[in-house]
Amino acid sequence: MTDPLSRAHAAALDAADPLRNLRDAFVFPQHGDDDQTYFVGNSLGLQPRAARAMVDEVLDQWGALAVEGHFTGPTQWLTYHQLVGDALARVVGAQPGEVVAMNTLSVNLHLMMASFYRPTAERGAILIEAGAFPSDRHAVESQLRLHGLDPATHLIEVEADEPNGTVSMSAIAEAIAQHGPHLALVLWPGIQYRTGQAFDLAEIVRLARAQGAAVGLDLAHAVGNLPLTLHDDGVDFAVWCHYKYLNAGPGAVGGCFVHARHATSDLPRMAGWWGHEQQTRFRMDPQFVPSPGAEGWQLSNPPVLALAPLRASLALFDQAGMAALRAKSEQLTGHLEQMIHARVPQVLQIVTPVEPARRGCQLSLRVAGGRARGRALFEHLHAAGVLGDWREPDVIRIAPVPLYNRFSDLHTFVEQVEAWAAA
């Protein structure tokens, strides 16, 4: 019987993988004569091979039609953003009218808070996790100040209460219950960027809405990583980026979800002409008539060249399906966890929760001996063509992405850790 932690077993798993051919749909950076062993899809996804042709299609249409490309040609720019809408909805578990690709994550977060953070004298607090991504914290604090409120009194932070710096569901529930009468908004991540912890979003939404608070999600590390059910969960809004697991390129256009119950609401918003209903947009009337659904929060015409790579990537998600991607992801990350425990337990400590339901593909790792040794291992891996990433103060993040990573890649990683430890 083959050793389940051997390279031979990994090769057999790769050969039996129903998604194995998707790897060929991506361009890999090179290390010498070989592909890099790339575990950084949680920071920047690889380039889909089809992206170049789709960008060229836009460039060719621009060259051939100039301004007329907005209304004629194979992919009219007037409605180009809608070419990704249905596929995006499938990835995040939404109805098509609930999603739009626009702006960037932090811009969209501000737009959503302008509509959904409506503080009153009694209810003005915003609840976040204490380890929130800095841009989210900056956005929240600035929104509080715009309303004349002090973050010291109106920003509620849920501290990590588990040994590895993760947050229990009971701590979240307790904080929502304790501050419920004063909460205007709960803003929570789908996955914590440093620890890799995934959260029970449906339960967080239920608890927050029961207290009368609006609920928003930052899905930067969850979209394309976990199956999501935003419509059924009832979240008010969600924002995310497309340059990580959605492979749309550096600085890619962001994504936004607004629940269907708000599709035709009179919520105040920061308005722009591309959010005006499409049928009358070019009449240039002074009165703003919003498009129904998430498209009504658009400001300017979409960046068509930036949307083209997203189209290429979403076609691969449709080909694979989120359920199949998640099944492979659980296998990959579980296999990596087993190998770390079996072969390098004296070197690496896994920060990320062990339960598959509480993590995505990423494992966050600490190196025994502290930060200096952690940096030394990180730099050794990089020099060997094994790319993870580093998050201060002391975490190496390794994210096996099911679209393009193999079980044999995990062995390359562990073998390099062993080589470094033995040196």
Curated annotation (Swiss-Prot):
A Gene Ontology cellular-component term: cytoplasm
Molecular-function GO terms, alphabetical: kynureninase activity; pyridoxal phosphate binding
Keywords (A to Z) from UniProt: Hydrolase, Pyridine nucleotide biosynthesis, Pyridoxal phosphate
One protein family per Pfam: KYNU_C
Binding of pyridoxal 5'-phosphate, residues: 105-106, 133-136, 218, 221, 243, 273, 301
N6-(pyridoxal phosphate)lysine, modified sites: 244
Cofactor requirement: pyridoxal 5'-phosphate
Catalysed reactions listed for this entry: L-kynurenine + H2O = anthranilate + L-alanine + H(+); 3-hydroxy-L-kynurenine + H2O = 3-hydroxyanthranilate + L-alanine + H(+)
Similarity comment: Belongs to the kynureninase family.
Subunit field text: Homodimer.
UniProt-listed PANTHER family: KYNURENINASE
HAMAP family named among the record's database cross-references: Kynureninase
Identification of the protein by name: Kynureninase
Source organism (scientific name): Xanthomonas axonopodis pv. citri (strain 306)
